[in-house]
Each structure stands twice: as structure tokens, then as C-alpha cells.
């Protein structure tokens, strides 16, 4: 009797006209994509037709004149996902929310509400916010230091999970004859007092269909990996090479085991930026078409942002990246190091580096045929580099349509991706059990 092949987990990261920095300039890109609800509804329905595990929406709380066009004007994620919940029935609905510029009660309430609205499909991507100027939008003058943001995040997540346990499953009786609306023994105050927060509770949203929405985490720095290993059920990451992805995978799984967790209950999903065509030559031509649309000053600015705002204007574009200290930056340390390693390993010039980074934001770029992409994905999963992928289409809507229509069927025929949904909740898609309420007797 042959054992069942390991199933690949698949999400799609939706972003306006697509993830390529110049996607908005492409002739096929819808001009109003980031603020068009009907457009997002069609993307969501396409992803669900492909039986993907989840939709993912990122968020940021600060913009300026140099920000990516997709983020200059876009929907707030909870509002958009609540709308998409009405036109989908199975696919997970996940979004980013910051622990640095939010309160635990707000986040607990928002995701609990989304879980109810979607009948158990909500997931929270925990981030600490990396943009320095965000503080200026929240009555602050300076962004919290990197390690302090993660300390705050750890306490934040524990409070949110505690608030999600405010009500036991059958707490609401609603007995019209006796006038008893709820069982007082099954309502629980949290009464948390910690270093960063004081939260009494209980939450004013009943126990959700999943018990608790799925926790996702995207940090790859030392602090980020520790938080992920301790709290996350799904981990997003940027990994460019098989070997580094395998190292990250092993490190996270080992750390999770040290925290007493089952490593098999954590899905690691790097972003992948696929450019797909019937032939390699046609795929390369599609990639070149997008790359040629990058405005040099925009590409350089994106690279500088990834390097903590360091000014590279004094260095020749066709020369090497100068030696820089990632630890001195208060930005995303994992992405800073990723860029440095790419430059050194592949002997890239600043120009080559900004074109690569600006196009994919540091994620793995794949250029080739549907069969080659299926091969690549299987190789990474089979060699313990990941458990699946967060698909980042360079150009939308074409990118998700091609993936669903041409790549998913290959994975299905190979027996590594389902042909039909086997559950209705995000937890069921990931093989995660419904958490037991901490107060249940």
C-alpha cells in the first residue's frame, strides 16, 4: 500500500494590479484595480475555483510620494475580506494587522467577527510594522525599536488568544421562557496585566466557528523566527534559494519543538513570483516586458527602503553594493540581510539588485512553463524547504488565472494538491485542530 503524497499548501497574495512594481504600467492592468470591489470579487472566485487554501491581503499604515502604486490607495483589509466572504464559501480569508499600532481588543474583535462572517475562514498575519514613518500617524515621533516591537507582539498575541476564549462554546442559552440569555459560568474575564498592556475582557463576540482564527507570522529575523516558532500556525517568508529555504525550514521546526509544539502543525510558505508561459522563451519575454517598465529612480528607492533608508546615490549603479550593517537598522532585518546575501552570492551590481528586488520585493522569481513550476514546487516541498507557497502574481488578473488554469491541474494530476475542498474552515484546510477553550471543563 503506497502512502499518500505530501499535499502542497497554496495561498494567493492579492495586490492591486500585481506584485511587480511596474505592473500598473502594463497595458493589460486595470487602472482602478486597488479600489475596485468587483475586480477583487473575481480574483477571489478564481482562487476558490482553483481550490486554493487562502487569500492573503497585506497592509501598511504609512505612505509617502515614493510608495508602491498598489499601496497609495487601497481598501482596508477587514472591510475588503468581509465583502469577499459573501462571494466565496471555502477559501481562507487572511490579512495583516500590526501589533505595534493596534490594541489587542480591537484585533481580537475584528478577526472574531470575520471568522463568524465567513463561517470559519479567518486568519491573522501578525506583523510589527517596519516603516519608520508609521509612528507619525499614531501620535508618535519615533518607531519602536526592533526587539521591543517583538516583545510587544508576543504579549499582544497571547492577549488576543485569551480574548478569543472569553466565551465557551455553549455560553449563549437565549432561553426566552426563563429570560436567561447566557450562562454566567461560561463567560470569562481575561484580567491581563503585563509589560505593555492591561486588558480585562471579556470580548463582546462569541466563540468563533474555528474556536480561534489561524495565526500567521511573516518575520524572518531572529526575533521574528522566535515569535513564529512560538505562536504561528502558518509562516510566510522570503526565500530565494533551495538551500537557504531548507535551513530556514529546519530552524523553525526545531525551535517550535523546543517550545513544546508539534512541528508538523506549522506550515511554512515562502512567497513565489511566477512568470508563466507555454515556453521558457515566452516566459522570459513576459518577464523582460515587466522589467523594462521599471523606472530606475523607483527601483533604486525600493532597494534603499529595504536597506533601512540608506542613500546609495553616491555609489555607481554598475558597481557592487557597499558593506552595510543590518543590525544597525530599525527596518526589516531579515529582508536587509536577504538583499545583502543575494548581492554577495550572485555578485550583483546595484542596478541588477534593484531591478531584481523592485520586481519581486526579494521573493523567489520563477520564469518558465507550468510543468517546470510544478516541478519546482514539488522539489521544494519534497526536500523540506517548505510546506507550500504563497503565490504572488506579478500581473493581475492574468497571473492568478494562468496559475489556476494551467499549474493547479498538473499538481492535482500528480496527487499533490486536492481536486476538491475536504473541509470548510481554514483550520481544516491546514489540518489544524480546533483549539480547546482554556476554561472548558
Swiss-Prot record:
CDD domains: Nitrilotriacetate_monoxgenase. Pfam families: Bac_luciferase. The keyword Flavoprotein applies. Changing residue 96 to V: Shows 0.9% of wild-type catalytic activity. InterPro entries: Diverse_substr_monoxygenases (IPR051260), Luciferase-like_dom (IPR011251), Luciferase-like_sf (IPR036661), NTA_MOA (IPR016215). Gene3D superfamilies: Luciferase-like domain. SUPFAM superfamilies: Bacterial luciferase-like. Its EC number is 1.14.13.-. GO terms for biological process: cysteine biosynthetic process. Pathway: Amino-acid biosynthesis; L-cysteine biosynthesis. It catalyses: N-acetyl-S-(2-succino)-L-cysteine + NADH + O2 + H(+) = N-acetyl-L-cysteine + oxaloacetate + NAD(+) + H2O. Changing residue 127 to G: Loss of catalytic activity. Keywords: Amino-acid biosynthesis, Cysteine biosynthesis, Flavoprotein, FMN, Monooxygenase, Oxidoreductase. FMN binds at residues 59, 96, 146, 150, 220-221. GO terms for molecular function: monooxygenase activity; oxidoreductase activity, acting on paired donors, with incorporation or reduction of molecular oxygen. Its cofactor is FMN. Disruption phenotype: Cells lacking this gene almost lose the ability to grow on 2SC as the sulfur source but are still able to grow on sulfate. Moreover, they show a massive accumulation of N-acetyl-S-(2-succino)cysteine when S2C is added to the medium. Catalyzes the oxidative cleavage of the C-S bond of N-acetyl-S-(2-succino)cysteine, forming oxaloacetate and N-acetylcysteine (NAC). Is involved in a S-(2-succino)cysteine (2SC) degradation pathway that allows B.subtilis to grow on 2SC as a sole sulfur source, via its metabolization to cysteine. Shows almost no activity on S-succinylglutathione and 2SC. The substrate N-acetyl-S-(2-succino)-L-cysteine arises from the spontaneous Michael addition of cysteine to the citric acid cycle intermediate fumarate. Homodimer. PANTHER family: ALKANESULFONATE MONOOXYGENASE-RELATED, C2H2 FINGER DOMAIN TRANSCRIPTION FACTOR (EUROFUNG)-RELATED. Belongs to the NtaA/SnaA/DszA monooxygenase family. This is N-acetyl-S-(2-succino)cysteine monooxygenase. It comes from Bacillus subtilis (strain 168). The gene is scmK.
Amino acid at each position: 500500500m503506497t502512502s499518500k503524497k505530501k499535499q502542497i499548501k497554496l495561498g494567493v497574495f492579492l495586490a492591486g494590479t500585481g506584485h511587480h512594481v511596474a505592473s500598473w504600467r502594463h497595458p493589460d492592468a486595470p487602472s482602478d484595480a486597488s479600489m475596485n470591489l468587483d475586480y477583487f470579487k473575481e480574483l477571489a472566485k478564481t482562487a476558490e475555483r482553483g481550490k486554493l487554501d487562502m487569500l492573503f491581503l497585506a497592509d501598511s499604515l504609512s505612505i509617502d510620494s515614493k510608495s508602491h502604486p498598489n499601496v497609495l490607495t487601497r481598501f482596508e483589509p477587514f472591510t475588503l475580506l468581509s465583502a469577499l466572504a459573501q462571494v466565496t464559501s471555502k477559501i481562507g480569508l487572511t490579512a495583516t494587522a500590526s501589533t505595534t499600532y493596534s490594541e489587542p481588543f480591537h484585533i481580537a474583535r475584528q478577526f472574531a467577527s470575520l471568522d463568524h462572517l465567513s463561517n470559519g475562514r479567518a486568519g491573522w498575519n501578525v506583523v510589527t510594522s517596519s516603516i519608520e514613518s508609521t509612528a507619525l500617524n499614531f501620535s508618535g515621533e519615533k518607531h519602536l525599536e526592533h526587539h521591543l516591537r517583538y516583545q510587544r507582539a508576543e504579549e499582544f498575541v497571547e492577549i488576543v488568544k485569551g480574548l478569543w476564549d472569553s466565551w465557551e462554546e455553549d455560553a449563549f442559552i437565549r432561553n426566552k421562557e426563563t429570560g436567561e440569555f447566557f450562562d454566567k459560568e461560561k463567560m470569562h474575564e481575561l484580567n491581563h496585566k503585563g509589560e505593555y498592556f492591561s486588558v480585562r475582557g471579556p470580548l463582546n463576540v462569541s466563540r468563533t466557528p474555528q474556536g480561534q482564527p489561524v495565526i500567521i507570522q511573516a518575520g524572518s529575523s531572529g526575533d521574528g523566527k522566535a515569535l513564529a516558532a512560538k505562536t504561528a500556525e502558518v509562516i510566510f517568508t522570503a526565500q530565494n534559494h533551495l538551500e537557504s529555504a531548507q535551513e530556514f525550514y529546519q530552524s523553525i521546526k526545531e525551535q517550535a519543538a523546543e517550545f513544546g509544539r508539534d512541528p508538523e502543525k506549522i506550515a511554512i510558505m515562502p512567497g513565489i513570483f511566477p512568470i508563466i508561459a507555454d515556453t521558457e522563451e515566452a516566459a522570459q519575454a513576459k518577464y523582460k516586458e515587466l522589467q523594462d517598465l521599471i523606472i530606475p529612480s523607483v527601483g533604486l528607492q525600493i532597494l534603499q527602503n529595504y536597506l533601512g533608508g540608506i542613500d546609495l546615490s553616491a555609489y555607481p549603479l554598475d558597481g557592487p553594493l557597499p558593506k552595510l550593517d543590518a543590525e544597525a537598522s530599525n527596518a526589516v532585518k531579515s529582508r536587509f540581510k536577504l538583499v545583502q546575501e543575494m548581492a554577495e552570492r550572485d555578485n550583483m551590481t546595484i542596478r541588477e539588485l534593484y531591478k531584481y528586488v523592485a520586481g519581486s520585493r526579494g521573493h523567489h522569481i520563477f520564469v518558465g512553463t507550468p510543468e517546470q513550476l510544478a516541478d519546482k514546487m514539488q522539489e521544494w516541498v519534497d526536500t523540506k524547504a517548505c510546506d507550500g507557497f504563497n503565490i504572488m502574481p506579478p500581473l493581475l488578473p492574468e497571473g492568478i488565472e494562468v496559475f489556476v488554469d494551467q499549474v493547479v491541474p498538473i499538481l492535482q494530476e500528480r496527487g499533490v494538491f486536492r481536486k476538491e475542498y475536504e473541509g470548510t474552515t481554514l483550520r481544516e484546510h491546514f489540518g489544524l485542530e480546533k483549539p480547546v477553550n482554556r476554561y472548558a471543563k
